[in-house]
Amino acid sequence: MKPRVFVTREIPERGLSKIEEHFELDLWKDEAPPSKKVIIERVKDCDALVSLLTDPIDAEVFEAAPKLRIVAQYAVGYDNIDVKEATKRGIYVTNTPGVLTETTADFAFALLMAAARRVVEADRYVREGKWKVAWHPMMMLGYDVYGRTLGIVGMGRIGAAVARRAKGFGMRILYYDSIRREDFEKELGVEYVPLEKLLEESDFVSLHVPLTEETYHMIGEEQLRRMKRTAILVNTSRGKVVDQKALYKALKEGWIAGAGLDVFEQEPIPPDDPLLKLENVVLAPHAASASHETRSRMAEMVAENLIAFKRGEIPPNLVNQEVVKVRPPGFQ
């Protein structure tokens, strides 16, 4: 008999078909995510769970699923999962790292470019019939990107990928990280500086850190006031890394020139959020990894993690390595 898995959203077929070869599949097909109540109900008899960032997976869910042995996250981040509790219960947690790196870096740079050159504003300007003069020397003035200074906060895989793109634009690249990356300094010519100096000297600041107690609201009023009035902030990491109220104030009052945001403190962003009324911010619906190729590869990685576990092997992308001491891999 195949082990049973609940998949909380319809993911690309390349992954689903592989999962279905090895598991009895229970798939949530609604576009809206299942509520926690629904997850608890559907996972009761499951051996495995495929989750997304919008799914709260905690002790209450684990308690309702005595057979649950693995949670395969369809994402790199996993702050929606109580990993400590999972480990205590001998539940393996996996994710999909690496595969998102290049497409997320593409998107971060796209937000940077769109905000700097006012691309979205210009599009609306044309569509709304406001373009009355063929050309005007002061129309839609933005900021150059080539040759400017980029500050990267978080020099991991994605931060380094953004740096590689910035090199092609002849940019000076500063970075701040909790760990100094001398390997990237040699490879990419990036310069390690304290966060304060990075904020003060950068024309663009791009955030690439995980959400932890240390990074929660690491960009707040104090940090935003340190930035240049002509600077642009880009966030493709986690919404709560930035104090959104302080950011609104900074954009509204002109402490900084603009922002490009793919993530927010509350997702979806409420329709009455004041950020939506500002012209100097480019907004996206947590879509940095949203390419056909990347999302399909993510689905395949989820399947690979599940299938390896079923074979009694340690999954290739295991988050909580210490769980191996609690329970060996497999559905035995």
UniProtKB/Swiss-Prot annotation:
It is found in: Cytoplasm. It comes from the Archaea. InterPro entries: D-isomer_2-hydroxyacid_DH (IPR050223), D-isomer_2_OHA_DH_cat_dom (IPR006139), D-isomer_DH_CS (IPR029753), D-isomer_DH_CS1 (IPR029752), D-isomer_DH_NAD-bd (IPR006140), Glyoxylate_reductase_GyaR (IPR023519), NAD(P)-bd_dom_sf (IPR036291). Its EC number is 1.1.1.26. Pfam families: 2-Hacid_dh (PF00389), 2-Hacid_dh_C (PF02826). Transmembrane segments: none annotated. SUPFAM superfamilies: Formate/glycerate dehydrogenase catalytic domain-like (SSF52283), NAD(P)-binding Rossmann-fold domains (SSF51735). It is an enzyme of class 1 (oxidoreductase). One of its GO terms (molecular function) is glyoxylate reductase (NADPH) activity. The active site is at R238, E267, H286. One of its GO terms (cellular component) is cytosol. NADP(+) binds at M155, G156, R157, I158, T236, S237, R238, H286, A287, A288. It catalyses: glycolate + NAD(+) = glyoxylate + NADH + H(+). Keywords: Cytoplasm, NAD, Oxidoreductase. Signal peptide: none annotated. Homodimer. Belongs to the D-isomer specific 2-hydroxyacid dehydrogenase family. GyaR subfamily. This is Glyoxylate reductase. The gene is gyaR.
